[in-house]
Amino acid sequence: MSPSPVERGRDDLGRVIVTTSTDLAAMPWEDLRGVDGATHKVLWQSGDNVIGLIRVEAGRTKPEHTHHGAHHHMLITRGSCVMLGTRVEEGSYIYVPPGVAHAVDDVGPDGVEFFYTYRPVEVGPAPDDDLVVAHPV
């Protein structure tokens, strides 16, 4: 079995990671902090960049929240729910830009599971003072 993200230190830049379906099934689901009926598995993490799975049980919701400084991509892998006012099911893709409120509502009878990426917005360096050119008045 491949090492878990915790065993890998959750920072594996430059390393190939192969996790089989058997390995993935053996990884424990962890409670998603602050959300009853929701669990997750972190598959890879480097700093604040995260790739993982989230599962929300039937009849539960993941309340509205906002990632102010991150891009959030999701691919529904099982079940259905409503996101951003649209019913989504297996195979649906959702992109939520930084700062946009979203929730997981109306979870179907089989719950919903999705693969997600969470990627913080990159902030470039401040302009170099030597490169700032004053324009003549």
What is each model feature region?
Residues 1, 61-72, 110:
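Short, surface-exposed loop and linker segments with low hydrophobicity and enrichment for Pro/Ser/Thr
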Residues 1-48, 130-137:
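A short, N-terminal "cap"/entry segment at the start of jelly-roll beta-barrel domains
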Residues 32-67, 87, 97-101, 134-135:
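Conserved short histidine dyad/triad with adjacent acidic residue
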Residues 55, 80, 117-118:
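Residue-level recognition of well-ordered beta-strand positions that form the cores
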Residues 58, 68-83:
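Glycine- and acidic-residue-biased ligand/ion/polar-headgroup-sensing regions
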Residues 70, 87, 98-127:
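Ligand-binding loop in jelly-roll beta-barrel domains
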